[in-house]
């Protein structure tokens, strides 16, 4: 029998319903795995007592034949989802001992469906980063290793802890957040399905903000079916979030295994020109095009002329919003406060923020403050907003001809810890292919589609029309079926 912690969400639900094992046994299998792989630093707060208590309640519900859709399923939450009575830090010193007195809407939705929380996962500080190296709790190590080298690799970011937890069989599924690629890029680096729904599908209430017009909750799973199950539980209108979309939660599970006949898939191959993409990624892209063609889809060559400006636009808009959002951390109401005798209020602000924020967060606050200053507002911020609209228009034009768009999730395979972190510009380019869809607020997923020559997983990104999570899952499921001969499992786990 498969080890319990290696079961998918769907298989776990089936096993629990059939009384093959209990939720308590399932949770204990995950706890054992977490204890065994603490060196990966995937979790920053463990909630094992809570998980076992929730598992007991789940077992009672199964005994009475009254289970919810996620009854007894162990999941992890990125440490920017507020959890009532449980430390929530966004992996920043400024919030290191913050304990919220309310629950985020997304975690509440999962609890309402019977989910069992194992703990809070590590992340880049305030979700700013793409390698999970800016956390105040230290970096996360990927469960994966290259076949020609034993060096520690990054899991991607900013949701690196969630990616490592699911990839290393330390959670059945894990919540992440995606602002410019923080679910899709780590999913690509760790061989997982990472899904970011349409902006507004999941409530942002109770999520620690980075860039409010871009932030969206997402999910990591080990199968596309699991992704559809988790999304149905997470999504839904919430009056506590003014950007929440008032739309029914669609049925998504029937998308799995659906026919690709008559589907048109857009491929913007011109975005891969100029040597930005590693050859292995280019090969995966071409192989996936053939796979979808053989499955009955029509491949359409498209262009997204303004997508190449995506990174520049993102690194004006996101820091601008962050500099505003992060102004609330001042040492007055909650979080860290640095004090000394006879200091003024301004000195307290200055010392608290200097001690509380890490280098990358300070860098982005300064960029944001600069682009919002009166002398730069027109030249940077307003111009970036105009180009953002052009990026969205490109997608609208493309979707007049196609049902979904195919792009790699990342231009490279996972790299070594410390390899690129001294050059912020190179780090920012990790999100080259994920940012455009974020700027347009579109649903998108990364699905494992191949291995590099060094045996590392590579993810293919599928982008859909607004509110069309169904077709994204349909394409992702077809790709998943086409590569089922490949084992996307790290060695030694």
Curated annotation (Swiss-Prot):
MF terms (GO), sorted A to Z: ATP binding; glutaminyl-tRNA synthase (glutamine-hydrolyzing) activity
Reaction catalyzed: L-glutamyl-tRNA(Gln) + L-glutamine + ATP + H2O = L-glutaminyl-tRNA(Gln) + L-glutamate + ADP + phosphate + H(+)
InterPro entries: Amidase, Amidase_CS, Amidase_dom, AS_sf, GatA
Organism superkingdom: Bacteria
Pfam families in UniProt: Amidase
Keyword Coiled coil (UniProt): no
Residues annotated as the enzyme's active site: 78 (charge relay system), 158 (charge relay system), 182 (acyl-ester intermediate)
GO cellular component, one term: glutamyl-tRNA(Gln) amidotransferase complex
Classification via SUPFAM superfamilies: Amidase signature (AS) enzymes
Name of the top EC class for this enzyme: ligase
The protein's Enzyme Commission number: 6.3.5.7
Record carries keyword Transit peptide: no
GO BP: translation
Transmembrane segments: none
Keywords for the protein's UniProt record, in alphabetical order: ATP-binding, Ligase, Nucleotide-binding, Protein biosynthesis
Quaternary state and interactors: Heterotrimer of A, B and C subunits.
The protein's role, per its UniProt record: Allows the formation of correctly charged Gln-tRNA(Gln) through the transamidation of misacylated Glu-tRNA(Gln) in organisms which lack glutaminyl-tRNA synthetase. The reaction takes place in the presence of glutamine and ATP through an activated gamma-phospho-Glu-tRNA(Gln).
Recorded family membership: Belongs to the amidase family. GatA subfamily.
HAMAP family named in the record: GatA
Protein name: Glutamyl-tRNA(Gln) amidotransferase subunit A
Organism listed in the record: Rickettsia felis (strain ATCC VR-1525 / URRWXCal2) (Rickettsia azadi)
Taxonomic lineage of the native organism: Bacteria, Pseudomonadati, Pseudomonadota, Alphaproteobacteria, Rickettsiales
Gene name tied to this protein: gatA
